[in-house]
Amino acid sequence: MELRSEQKDFVDYAADMIKEGKYFICEMPTAFGKSFSALMLAKKLIDEKTVQRVIIATSNNSLAKSIFLEAKAVKDMPDYVLGIGKSNYLDLNKLALFLDSDIGSEILPLNKEIIEAALKKLTIDFPDILIEDFLNELDMVDTNKREYIASNLALEKSNSESFKEYPIQITNYAFLLYKFMFDEKYEEPEDTAYIFDEVQELPNMAELTLNSSFSLYGYYLQLKTIVKIIRDNPSAPKTLVKLLDEEVEHTKTINEIMQDEKIAGKTLMSNELVARKATAVLNKLFNQEKSKALIAKLNKFYKKDPFFQLGIFLNKFNDVKSTLRSKDLYVSFSQERGFISFHTYDMDIKLKLADRFWSKIDSFVGITATALLTQDDFELEIYKRAGINLSDIKLVDRVIKGRKSKVWPIISFKGILRPEQATYSITDKAFIEDDEKRFEYFADEILRGYDGKNTMILVGGFDEVKLLAQKLESIKDKLILAEQGRSVQNVIENFKKSGGILIATRNYATGINLKGETLERLFITKLPYPVYQTKKWAILKEKNDRFFWFEYTNEMVITFRQAIGRLIRSPEDTGKIFLLDGKFNSLPEVTKKRLICFLEKVAVKE
């Protein structure tokens, strides 16, 4: 494969930025070939001895694996390796023993030939099997079962084995951030350059790396499940069953004590009230003599008669204690379920990125299809969103130096796609408040506009997936539905095979590639704002309402850009985009102009 002219322009320009020790983010349109371009940049940097090592990092295992496999097509590629952490690979020896056990037949009640066929398929292009790929290939949806396999059948690779000293290393953000964020002394050699694919996802991955949660409701449900299974086991000691029954009632009692009108329906920042409640839960659940005796008996029982729900429960136990002891804790209360949840959330994530991550990065190239949030090609907003401090930050004992001198203005490279390949239309109707009538309107518009073509419809959540499916009952045989617990990759593979109409959530706005006739119609029934009840947005809204709306809108614009980019993936593709959300018409004019600007980059108005 040879570089196209626009790809060569990127490689040459980015290599110069690395030589000058710059931070450089560029925007690449759909079908630019960003993975291939990143690999060729890494090759150039190593071949010309600009640096000794290049680390290519991306947002998830699937993308990292895809880049690794694409490197096989690059002629005379320097040595490269995939390193994505020690708990992502399937241990085939553990799997063989697992399949012969009682617990194995409970979790994977499948014919061995089916499992062997899956393993054979997954090793055609890739020597090590990713647990995520294995579970998706078997179409496993149950979250508890997935979690059990991930926890118990992982290949025990050390970091050095999975991330060897090769000139080019391909990894994911979680692995890279874990090394930097949890080992303050960790540094790569000075002659290392970084290429960050999907760079806009880096701060989101930092949040996932640093945060945890404990739900009293989840704990209660796990207990009830374990009680039922053990009670039905004739060999279970009666004393264990009695202790479990008492623990279930104990948990309900604790929850009643924890309830407080001051926190009902609210999100609280870390304060004395939260600390007292967390301490109370910790003491009442885990520090009572009965609780300690219960855990000891459960561990003993598990050694004799294991089952996966109990394995998950015991594995999580220490993590729960760690969460409840955290200083950065807040409480949320579910009025629907009647239980409180505790969450750690570090409001200083950007500060920690500046201190522990960016301060150790000498130069990098960031690649994204959604760098720009306005029509201004020279904005630096994406650098700030990624936690790069443009000015000095004064801490108690030191100063984190500002990185503005390293930051280079965003450059948007031209691609090979033309807006004339697609059309777009925007509803002129006001938002319909009544859910039933609104979804009837959506169904009418979809039936009128999809023309029998392969179609994706983006809705607001899984409840809306079901509601729209009901309204499209007349074509139910064509529908494929996103499901909670089922991976995006798994659903997309089914859609590729069968075609039809995929009703999906905002999670499907990025990371999928549906070329040609695989996708020709895209309906957006709800502007893809993030779920504001999640901890990040709930805390931000409580702390600074004005800044919340600024960030909240920016997040929607980024996801909207990603969503409309799903339709046209190659110069041969054609299609239509339908924006059906009536709330568009009540948006501020500046937000409307931003969305229309990005629509017109990929389509012309119908």
Where are the predicted features?
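Conserved pre-motif I regulatory segment
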Residues: 1-27
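Walker A/P-loop
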Residues: 20-40
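Signature of the SF2 helicase/ATPase Hel1-core->accessory helical subdomain module
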Residues: 62-65, 69, 148-292, 369-388, ...
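Conserved RecA-like P-loop NTPase helicase motor core
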Residues: 414-432, 485-585
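Conserved interdomain hinge at the start of the Helicase C-terminal
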Residues: 418-460
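Conserved helicase motor "Helicase C" RecA-like lobe of SF1/SF2 P-loop NTPases
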Residues: 459-484
